[in-house]
Amino acid sequence: QMQVFQMITKSQRIFSHAQVSKASSQLPAPEGKPAALRPLQGPWPQQLPPLAPAVDSLNAGPGNPEAEGSPARRRKTTPGVAREASPGNTRRDAKGGLKVAAVPTPLAAPSLDPSRNPDISSLAKQLRSSKGTLDLGDIFPSTGQRQTQLGGEELPGASLPGKQAPAENGAVSGTTKGEKGPPCSRGGGYRLLGNPRAPRFSGFRKEKAKMDMCCAASPSQVAMASFSSAGPPADPSKSKLTIFSRIQGGNIYRLPHPVKEENVAGGGNQQNGGSTDWTEPRSTFICKNCSQMFYTEKGLSSHMCFHSDQWPSPRGKQEPQVFGTEFCKPLRQVLRPEGDRHSPPGAKKPLDSTAAAPLVVPHSIPVVPVTRHVGSMAMEQEKDGEERDSKESSQQRKRKKRPPPKRLFIPPPPSTAGEPGPAGCHQSRLRSPMFLVDRLLKGLFQCSPYTPPPMLSPIREGSGVYFNTLCSTSTQASPDQLISSMLDQVDGSFGICVVKDDTKISIEPHINIGSRFQAEIPELQERSLAGIDEHVASLVWKPWGDMMINPETQDRVTELCNVACSSVMPGGGTNLELALHCLHEAQGNVQVALETLLLRGPHKPPTHLLADYRYTGSDVWTPIEKRLFKKAFYAHKKDFYLIHKTIQTKTVAQCVEYYYIWKKMIKFDCGRAPGLEKRVKREPEEVERTEEKVPCSPRERPSHHPIPELKIKTKSYRRESILSSSPNAGPKRTPEPSGSVESQGIFPCRECERVFDKIKSRNAHMKRHRLQDHVEPIVRVKWPVKPFQLKEEELGADIGPLQW
């Protein structure tokens, strides 16, 4: 023990006993209740006074002219070296205060009278009046008995919750609610807390003292100096950080008066005379709403997030500043300044009105000594904080946070009156002109009719349901406002406004009144006069004679309709409507109607109502037009406008009609030429070779038009079924058993009757016919094709549309 005090005396040579006496004389105990401090037990009670100057010596110098015992001097006092909290001894009393229980030790010594050691009690008062905590474990040994409980009233500055400064080794142990904390990594020492409920001195442990003035201040000292609240009392109107502000991470701590605190921190560093090489210069960020300081952009952004959401205080009052980590138990109470009515009943009001709420400093906070001027510090931080955001954020954050998606904005429906009408009706957004130009000559301006949505305005200029709208890019206008761009000028003398489709016209909903919006109702007449009136419509079909009752007449009419639908008739059998009209003009005579269809055609006088009526398939296509149509179809597929531009003699409607008529007869396949064209263009030697392999005796007939039953065939079309169902349908050969043909090594194709020597060749050839699944061609020319080798134009002309 003597060696320890020799080392203390050697390191504290510059301190005098006069300063100790002066400091102790200015800290009297409160009247009425003596603050009895049971001294530390040990064999060296008379050598404790040199410790008191160590507290004030940290800020001693020409920069602090105040008296050493004054409240201003105590506010600027820098705490000593930080230490860990004691494991297992910190517990919470019934009212939320912290208690430090005394731990009995086997070492016992006679207790000393407190009156014989006035310096120790004054030292305890001075330590408790400081804002930070002082670690005395580096000075006193831990062999003595642990301290006992202090009595009396709380001292000035001690009524606020104490702040636990972090240990230098980064290991801080605490307790959570109702649980004991983990064991301390450094062992025996205990924390001295400025708690108003049960303040106690902690035990001390023996360690190497580092109190020399030439040494650099520890990070804990600078941290407490920079975070000490040396300004006026905290303003209750200013919002403090809540526990909600801590859940996003980052170092978020409130500085009520950052200008004065940073000035004090800078002064303390200069007075200490130590180097600050242990810190790295980093940027600080200040909240523009509540003037709180942050050391990371992440902390500021999370703080601003809760500013925007307006988190309410749980009990409508200021929240205590607590740790967001697992090492410290959050305090339950917040002591208000004097005069606060909302203070908890169990909390004592502080005697010193200038004391501010203490701060909680975690062990991982990066402390930056700031040496800016007092007047320009806040303004410079607001300007420089935004400029350094992009640079510092890329270095401090390891990974970038994915930006959140933009919120969906649904613009409200517009309303001229400020609120929607009944049943949620709103004004129409469809463009309508203000005035009708054709009504201006009457001398009165007539408003345009109201067109409720989704109806389209009948007097619109454009051709679309919705007019073109552009969102405003200015910051003042809301996104749902439309840009009213007048493409034409307004004549102010007459009030005529010719607007375009992208003009927003404000028309209030109203009932359209006038003869233009009302139906013309004729006068009421007798029902007997209705039979005399002639029908306005033209009669184009009427069942004549006994057609409705005679079955034979009905059968003849049915046969006429079947012939009109076959390829016997000009137009490809698409003139069923024409046949019925001819039968009506013949007054039910089927023979006269058939002659009209085949020979004369429907000749109508110019005064007839159907004189200009166009029947389907009545257009005449020349061979050149058919060739151009096929070439254009292979090039442009079903783009009939380009096909019309290629032909130039037929309209788009005529091209579409021609395509769908011939689609039932000849397949237009872009992948390959139609089967009919290939059969026509076969080489003569191939035909002769086929005839030698498959002997046949074709039966010829003058006409090669198939009957109506062969109009449309599916893929399951078989040659044998055609030959059996229609023996006179067209050129064909006698069917032979398939086994006899295949037994001779000949494999014909059942679709196009091409003959192959190998079955694999025929199977590969059959893949070409799989593309044609929808319809089979009507015209199927059978082998041999020698008598029917016609040109493409002649073949198309024979099966073409009507020829009158």
UniProtKB/Swiss-Prot annotation:
BP-aspect Gene Ontology terms: cell differentiation; male meiotic nuclear division; negative regulation of DNA-templated transcription; positive regulation of DNA-templated transcription; regulation of DNA-templated transcription; regulation of transcription by RNA polymerase II; spermatogenesis
Q: Domain of life of the organism in this record?
A: Eukaryota
Q: Where is the composition biased (Basic residues)?
A: 396-405
- Report residue spans for region: Disordered: 21-120, 133-197, 379-426, 680-743
Q: Which PROSITE patterns match?
A: ELM2 (PS51156), SANT (PS51293), ZINC_FINGER_C2H2_1 (PS00028), ZINC_FINGER_C2H2_2 (PS50157)
Keywords assigned by UniProt, alphabetized:
Activator, Developmental protein, Differentiation, Meiosis, Metal-binding, Nucleus, Repeat, Repressor, Spermatogenesis, Transcription, Transcription regulation, Zinc, Zinc-finger
Q: Which GO terms describe its cellular component?
A: histone deacetylase complex; nucleus; transcription regulator complex
Translocase as a keyword of this entry, yes or no, is no
**Domain annotation ELM2: ranges:** 509-601
Residues in SANT domain copies: 616-667
Cross-referenced InterPro entries: ELM2_dom, Homeodomain-like_sf, SANT/Myb, SANT_dom, Trans_reg/Corepressor, Znf_C2H2_type
Compositionally biased, Basic and acidic residues: which spans? 380-395, 690-721
According to the UniProt entry, its GO molecular function terms are:
transcription corepressor activity; zinc ion binding
Intracellular or extracellular location(s): Nucleus
Report C2H2-type zinc finger ranges. 285-307, 747-769
Which stretches are transmembrane? none
Q: What does this protein do?
A: Transcription regulator which is essential for male fertility and for the completion of meiotic prophase in spermatocytes. Regulates progression of the pachytene stage of meiotic prophase by activating the expression of genes involved in meiosis and post-meiosis during spermatogenesis. Maintains the repression of pre-pachytene transcriptional programs, including meiotic double-strand breaks (DSB) formation genes in pachytene spermatocytes and suppresses aberrant DSB formation after mid-pachytene, thus ensuring meiosis progression.
Query: Subunit details for this protein?
Result: Interacts with DNTTIP1. Identified in a complex with KCDT19, HDAC1 and HSPA2s. Component of a histone deacetylase complex containing DNTTIP1, ZNF541, HDAC1 and HDAC2. Identified in a complex with HDAC1, HDAC2, DNTTIP1 and KCTD19.
What is the protein name stated in its UniProt record? Zinc finger protein 541
Q: What organism does the record attribute this protein to?
A: Macaca fascicularis (Crab-eating macaque)
The gene for this chain is ZNF541
